Amino acid sequence: MHSDITPIHTHKKYWAECFGTAPFLPTSRKEMDALGWDSCDIVLVTGDAYVDHPSFGMAIIGRLLEAQGFRVGIIAQPQWQDKTDFMSLGKPNLFFGVTSGNMDSMINRYTSDRKLRHDDAYTPNNEGGKRPDRATLVYSQRCREAYKDVPIVLGGIEASLRRVAHYDYWSDKVRRSVLLDAKADILLFGNAERALVEVAHRLAEGEEIAQMTNIRGTAVNLAAEPEGYTIIDSSRIEKPRKEAFIPPNPYEVETQCETKSEEPKAQPITIRPSRHDAATTAVRLPSFEKLQNDRILYAHASRILHLETNPYSGRALIQRHGNRELWVNQAPIPLTTEEMDYVFGLPYARVPHPKYGKAKIPAYDMIKTSVNIMRGCFGGCSFCSITEHEGRIIQNRSQESILTELEEIRDKVPGFTGTISDLGGPTANMYRLGCSDPKAEANCRRPSCVFPGICNKLNTDHKHTIDLYRAARQVKGVKKVMIASGVRYDLAIESPEYVKELVTHHVGGYLKIAPEHTEKGPLDLMMKPGMGTYDRFKEMFDKYSQEAGKKQYLIPYFISAHPGTTDEDMLNLALWLKKNNYECDQVQNFYPSPMCNATSMYYSETNPLKRVKYKQREDVPVAKGDRQRRLHKALLRYHDPANWPLIREALITMGKKYLIGDKPGCLVPAEDVDARTPAQRRKSGRHGANRFATKHTSTQPGFPGDKANAGSGKKPTRGGQSNSAPSRSGSATGGKHPQRSGANTGGKSSGGKNSPRAGGRNQPSRAR
């Protein structure tokens, strides 16, 4: 399939390869002089500190371009108030590569309540304020001021998820594509190594960047529609233009793939290819101007966008912005295993740049002994952008490449103790899983391979993952291999052998999984499995933990205020937590990040997962007001006395006054309990048995297994990574993982970072 694609490691190298490999990519003129360079071919500008590690975007992109023969310099966290820092490496011969960093700068700087954060895990000493709001725009402006005639290439998570007109939570309005606002020359979206290498070589050959309009995984700003394309008009919901040819609408088909939960009599999947060649067809989205004032049309546009993400059958998109046309090419072809091995096998130093001295960079400390084994996610959770950024098709590394990296960690990472903190990716257990039918995979438009049930064509055999775990444990010098990426438990229960292997050898006391909610309404809109699946996994987890002679615990993640969640839903979740003796130390309030389906629900109050019409649509209840969002968060922390007055008021309003009091079935005590001291409340049994944190600190508070594990020599490990950990998969000029919409940490901590992962988070890695 697509045999005409040139592997990224087979391009003819640029002449400057004669300079060899730099110990670190230069960040100053002095370092350039030491390498014998008179100039840089490419200068990368990033909002993160420069850590030469494959979990950091600039390192992957910089080392990849260096391997192609280019001289690459890095300007990390420049002073953006003027152009001085942007001229520190001189004028690049080819282009500036600009990214906000591993995270969207707005998510990095603000909480879900739009409060300014005072820390930054990607900055030395966790110092906040080292990058501007909308860093991609600001950096692009300064690059243009520094050298007006140098092309600007945008990439990373911020640019990728803002490539079309999008709802912006912080300004509460629809904004233009970041490409037009930044006035850059081209935007690369997703894990764009393939596109970036092509752009670099074509520029090196003397081609004008304005001529590069047909590269997969890119978006460009055009004056008019390109010639040679059939344009399908989806700019309206019910009244398309009469002059446009309207083929049978592929978005009207509501049939689902056969799932494993269905009866055997279910009909098999029927492949119905489009009557148009995807390579010469484009879909017109509603214009930016229309989306500004029409929320229902925005939901329609979001639906179309998400249905065109398949790299094999998805079509180009075109969207009017004033008198300009935004042209978004087809999604990039996924990297092969050989290409993935090439990217992760580049000569990374695996430590921060020496200029930072002894300063601690929290994001690096979190992932310095972890290994990314794959990219992509076919979970399709509506609050997560991984599919839109990394793709639904899993891109795997070979076992040999992964084991080699384990040996590099052993040999290169200072202070390595023998523990590998994670083998994972967006999820822990999608390694080498995927569609068993290439034809179906090439034409499928399902947003998820596992919802509402696991597709019969999905290979769920975890054999390769089990073999990898066993091989990793045999690497000399490796004493323990932990799995910190979130486990997709609906997949795991399809392979009991995997669950046994995981629980027996790779859980350090706690394992984080993400049911996200207990109620069917929110779960369906999240595209998450029901609690019955969670219960089955918990039974297996407890069974195998007991067989292994270990006391281990599941830590469930939940989201408050997700679109589709009513006060009644959150109350039922709180009652479930109390019934199961769970007390969330910190909670997650839904965070509408760009391009997520859930963000479209939040803005439009309409379900974009189904066909959208003005008079025929599914409306979605949304918690938008500050008070209701506080209430939903408070219900997740029902045990916190500070939340009791708000919960009491809500219970009375809902006609649930019987849940106030000291009876076993009550959620919060009567008002007279407020005057008691914390010690008195603990003595009265107001606190549940299982108190847990959803954002890890250096210790895990209050879980009953701590003493048992300590006594047996088994240290509880991070069952999931901190919300401030970096993501771990490559994308053009940085930004390694899409952030989750629902990943803001709340509770007592106001400074918790949003994860770029789904898991992981990543986007920390959190299974979605």
UniProtKB/Swiss-Prot annotation:
Domain Radical SAM core: 363-640
Cofactor: [4Fe-4S] cluster
Textual note on the cofactor: Binds 1 [4Fe-4S] cluster. The cluster is coordinated with 3 cysteines and an exchangeable S-adenosyl-L-methionine.
UniProt KW Iron keyword: yes
This protein's UniProt keywords: 4Fe-4S, Iron, Iron-sulfur, Metal-binding, S-adenosyl-L-methionine
Molecular functions (GO terms): 4 iron, 4 sulfur cluster binding; catalytic activity; iron ion binding
Segments for region (Disordered): 674-768
S-adenosyl-L-methionine found in the keyword field: yes
Taxonomy, superkingdom: Bacteria
Biased composition range(s): Basic residues: 679-689
Residues that coordinate or bind [4Fe-4S] cluster: C377, C381, C384
InterPro entries named among the record's database cross-references: Elp3/MiaA/NifB-like_rSAM (IPR006638), Methylthiotransferase_CS (IPR020612), rSAM (IPR007197), rSAM_horseshoe (IPR023404), UPF0313 (IPR022946), UPF0313_C (IPR024560), UPF0313_N (IPR013704)
Entry-linked PROSITE patterns: RADICAL_SAM
Stretches with biased composition (Polar residues): 719-731
SUPFAM superfamilies named in the record: Radical SAM enzymes
NCBIfam families: SAM_YgiQ (TIGR03904)
Family: Belongs to the UPF0313 family.
Official protein name in the record: UPF0313 protein VV2143
Organism the protein comes from: Vibrio vulnificus (strain YJ016)
